[in-house]
């Protein structure tokens, strides 16, 4: 979601850059070097960060040594605070192409194939993004043809009891087979995001219901404007359509 990779990641990246800047400045004072002439590297043997003069690793200090010396010299703590609230909020996008099959005898809707395109800028973790888009489609499909909250029209209170019998959830056998779900990521770059990234969570679910409903319309020629499109709803609509054609 945007609040994660974009807001949280952006804040972390900004803090890391500021702390690095402070580290190099303090290290320069301790090592009698200009901050711009130092570099921050990873000491793989010691498993810790180190500031050194490029080309002269013998003239270096660990991050821990620099931080301790800064405190001992009363130069303050090397730290920085930033807000998760970012100055920008770039939109993310998804597009769904859905193939459905409608059994006109039972009203059951199945999805043989799905193609999803997602735009989250530079994907920080492509596998995680694809997994989120896949999972979000399954949730959206469930919203479209299965899940329904029944409320009291007068009080607004829920009439369901929280049982699987009164709040239908699709099982894995009713979900689209993951092998038939193709997910592609657009190669874009968000200049205000960390390393060009932006969120995807908000858009991952947004167009699923419309795509499935449009595919159902293309299959049986009936528009549905209320969800869920359950088998009972499909059969009633088909019966009404058949009656209208005979009249």
Please provide the spans of the model-predicted regions.
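C-terminal catalytic domains of large/alpha subunits in multi-subunit enzymes
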Residues: 1-247
């Amino acid at each position: 979601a945007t609040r994660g990779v974009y807001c949280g990641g952006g804040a972390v990246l900004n803090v890391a850059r500021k702390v690095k800047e402070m580290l190099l400045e303090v290290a320069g004072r301790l090592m009698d070097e200009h901050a711009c002439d130092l570099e921050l590297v990873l000491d793989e043997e010691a498993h810790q960060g180190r500031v050194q003069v490029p080309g002269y690793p013998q003239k270096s200090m660990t991050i821990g040594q620099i931080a301790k010396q800064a405190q001992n010299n009363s130069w303050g703590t090397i730290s920085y605070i930033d807000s998760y609230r970012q100055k920008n909020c770039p939109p993310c996008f998804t597009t769904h192409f859905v193939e459905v099959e409608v059994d006109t005898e039972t009203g059951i809707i199945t999805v043989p194939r799905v193609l999803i395109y997602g735009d989250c800028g530079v994907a920080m973790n492509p596998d995680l993004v694809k997994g989120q888009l896949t999972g979000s489609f399954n949730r959206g499909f469930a919203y479209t043809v299965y899940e329904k909250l029944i409320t009291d029209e007068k009080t607004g209170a829920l009439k369901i009891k929280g049982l699987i019998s009164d709040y239908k959830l699709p099982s894995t056998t009713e979900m689209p087979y993951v092998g038939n779900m193709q997910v592609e990521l657009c190669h874009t770059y968000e200049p205000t995001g960390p390393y060009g990234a932006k969120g995807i969570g908000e858009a991952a679910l947004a167009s699923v219901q419309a795509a499935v409903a449009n595919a159902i319309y293309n299959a049986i020629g009936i528009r549905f404007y209320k969800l869920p499109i359950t088998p009972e709803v499909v059969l009633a609509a088909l019966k009404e359509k058949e009656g209208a054609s005979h009249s």
